[in-house]
Amino acid sequence: FRSEFMFMGRDGHLPDEEEQYQAYRRAVEGMQGMPVTIRTVDVGADKPLDRTPMRAGEDHLNPALGLRAIRWSLSEPSMFLAQLRAILRAAAHGPVNLLIPMLAHASEIRQTLSLINRARDQLTNAGVPQGGGDSVGRAVRSTNTAISCRVTGAEAQ
């Protein structure tokens, strides 16, 4: 499930947690017990959002290397937490795997896992049913990241 398409073409209004939850839940229930892999927002040069103006430093020669995918999500923690809560809530309805795009560095892995745990805690404290998220994976798209998997793999497990 490529979640970024829910965030695009919305005239500056991002989907809230409830809207995302309903979409993910429908996908999970529609798969009737088969696992669903939900990729967190992967926006950037090739899939820009109409909501955010270009930030300082994003006008370099290769915009694909700028603030995108997990880097964008980590820079927008309230949006990312809402997405994570929606995914965890949908996982109460069937098996869900979480795919994090362009997760490359150990620090990004630690930040992401910390936010996943925070989202779990928020749902638990609110008494909201959630699934475990059967696995968390990362999309590897660069040679450097592929080579570093041996090092960062200990962080990701």
Which residues does each PLM region occupy?
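Conserved alpha/beta-domain cores
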Residues: 1-157
